[in-house]
């Protein structure tokens, strides 16, 4: 159901590779019955220097993360915050790749279902030429402050997602399966909206976090 709990999240990282690079910030909001009910915002100590280009993009520098908890401490808290919810992100493949890789690295078993708001935007806003977060926000008259800061991007994405839920209901779409079918059938859609699923199994009992 589209009224199920969702956790809309965004991460900032030291680069684009989930294997080679590290998370430096996680921001998330929990959406239940179409309203934001809780927020999660934390810096993460990547244990490596933040590249200058990332500092320029995000405004996050080494002094801001040096006293922060590491991903080993932060990730279980984020997963607890997200418990029982479908994950949502803008360009979700990128954000989820880091979450999935870190779960594997820490031996955390996890079963994710997640939705990409880029796919939703392509279906519901076919007149747009680009689907970047700031472009979609502008089209929906949603303000985006401090772009490329995780909690602000997550809050903006949540507002977008709540509007998308309303737009779906106006089209008599009330669950993810019907949404998938609508995405496939829309002549304007660039690609269908996938509901992604990822299952991470701990490879050994050693270092496993429950």
Write out the residue ranges for each language-model feature.
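Conserved non-catalytic scaffold segment of RNase H-like nuclease domains
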Residues: 1-112, 126-148
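Phosphodiester-processing cores and adjacent nucleic acid-binding clamps
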Residues: 7, 92-93, 97-99, 103-148, ...
């Amino acid at each position: 159901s589209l009224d199920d709990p969702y956790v809309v999240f965004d991460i900032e990282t030291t680069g684009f590779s989930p294997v080679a690079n590290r998370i430096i910030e996680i921001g998330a909001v929990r959406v239940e019955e179409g309203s934001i009910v809780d927020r999660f915002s934390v810096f993460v100590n990547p244990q490596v220097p933040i590249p200058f280009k990332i500092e320029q993009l995000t405004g996050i520098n080494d002094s801001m993360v040096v006293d922060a908890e590491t991903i080993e401490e932060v990730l279980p808290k984020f997963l607890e915050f997200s418990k029982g919810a479908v994950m949502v992100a803008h360009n979700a493949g990128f954000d989820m790749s880091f979450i999935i890789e870190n779960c594997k690295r820490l031996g955390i078993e996890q079963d994710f279902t997640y939705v990409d708001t880029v796919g939703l935007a392509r279906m519901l806003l076919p007149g747009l030429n680009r689907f970047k977060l700031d472009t979609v926000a502008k089209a929906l008259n949603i303000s985006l402050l401090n772009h490329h800061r995780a909690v602000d991007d997550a809050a903006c994405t949540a507002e977008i997602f709540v509007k998308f839920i309303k737009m779906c209901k106006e089209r008599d779409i009330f669950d993810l399966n019907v949404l998938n079918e609508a995405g496939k059938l829309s002549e304007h859609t660039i690609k269908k909206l996938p509901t992604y699923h990822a299952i991470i199994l701990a490879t050994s009992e050693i270092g496993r976090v429950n």
